[in-house]
Regions:
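Membrane-cytosol interface at the C-terminal ends of specific transmembrane alpha-helices
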Residues: 138-177, 185-186, 190-191
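Short hydrophobic faces within alpha-helices
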Residues: 71, 96, 113, 160, ...
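N-terminal signal-anchor/first transmembrane alpha helix
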Residues: 1-33
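Loop-to-helix entry region at the N-terminal start of transmembrane alpha-helices
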Residues: 16-17, 66-73, 129-156, 196-198
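Interhelical loop and adjacent transmembrane-helix boundary motif
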Residues: 8-12, 45-62, 211-269, 278-282
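Transmembrane alpha-helices
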Residues: 17-27, 150, 157-160, 183-212, ...
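Membrane-interfacial helix termini and adjacent extracytoplasmic/periplasmic loops
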Residues: 6, 48, 120-150, 184, ...
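Transmembrane-helix boundary motif in ABC transporter permease subunits
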Residues: 2-8, 78-111, 124, 128-132, ...
Length: 282
């Protein structure tokens, strides 16, 4: 019986490694091909000129102004989208959990609704709105922050909702209220520190999604990283592929940080609190 279990365990281990190897080749081979393409000069020899230019910001800005404009615009869009999403979503989800539990399903439906709406449909609906946005706020690409908050909403909501589900929000709030804390104190000093990893997860997901968005920015005639890469591909395929590879690596890095922070938060929540032995009375 023990030998049968051992053989089954070995077969499962081999199967897992085969699956992991196949998936690794499937995902990493195109990345290696992109890297090889960006390091191949016109004479066929290996060169790092493309990557040296990519990290030399003044020279890159002078050589490829559309790309530099898109990078700056995307950084601003990432920052403002994350801030706007957290300011709108975190208090709303916490308040619904604490005071309006009957509206939880409705809020969940509204937050997940963008998953069913294609980006092109969003553009059709947002185009008249952005005509007024341009009239009042100008044609800055940072105004895409309002549009990007919609597609990132489902992912941010799921991350924050999972964090709230892992703690006893009601007990924490009732304990804080019994000690005289206001609702604002309960929200920002009691609940929020306990879902810090969930908030970071939501922020990382938003960064990855905003950096990869193309359709909305292109159809609304705004600039971002993906629009800059698309324009760059018409004049310099090597630099376009290099920037795409750098963006993919950045997104993978953010997802890796997401898994690390998420795993650390789960382990911290599962670790039992240390028990302090009571002193014996004399």
């Amino acid at each position: 019986m023990a030998g049968l279990i051992a053989r089954r365990a070995r077969k499962q281990a081999v199967f897992r490694w085969v699956v992991v190897t196949v998936l690794a080749v499937f995902f990493l081979l195109p990345l290696f091909a992109m890297l090889e393409f960006t390091t191949r000069g016109q004479d066929g020899k290996l060169t790092g000129e493309t990557w040296r230019l990519l990290v030399d910001w003044p020279k890159l800005r002078a050589t490829y102004p559309d790309l530099s404009t898109g990078i700056v615009a995307s950084l601003g869009q990432v920052l403002f989208t994350v801030v706007l999403m957290l300011v709108l979503l975190v208090p709303t989800v916490i308040w619904v959990r604490l005071r309006l539990p009957g509206l939880r399903r409705l809020v969940e439906f509204i937050c997940l609704l963008p998953l069913t709406i294609p980006a092109i449909v969003l553009v059709v609906g947002l185009a008249p709105v952005y005509a007024w946005v341009t009239y009042f706020l100008g044609g800055s690409s940072l105004t895409l922050t309002f549009a990007y908050t919609i597609p990132v909403l489902p992912y941010a909501y799921r991350a924050i909702d999972a964090g709230l589900s892992a703690i006893d929000v009601r007990t924490l709030s009732e304990a804080a209220r019994s000690l005289g804390a206001s609702w604002a104190t309960v929200m920002w000093r009691v609940v929020l520190p306990n879902i810090r990893s969930a908030v970071l997860s939501a922020a990382f997901l938003d960064v990855a999604l905003v950096l990869g968005e193309f359709t909305i920015a292109s159809l609304l005639n705004r600039s971002n990283l993906q629009v800059g890469i698309n324009l760059l591909g018409k004049s310099s395929a090597t630099m376009s592929v290099a920037v795409s590879l750098a963006a993919l690596v950045l997104a993978f890095g953010l997802l890796l940080l997401l898994s690390l922070f998420g795993g650390r938060g789960v382990r911290a929540s599962m670790d039992p609190a240390p028990v302090v032995p009571a002193k014996e009375s004399a």
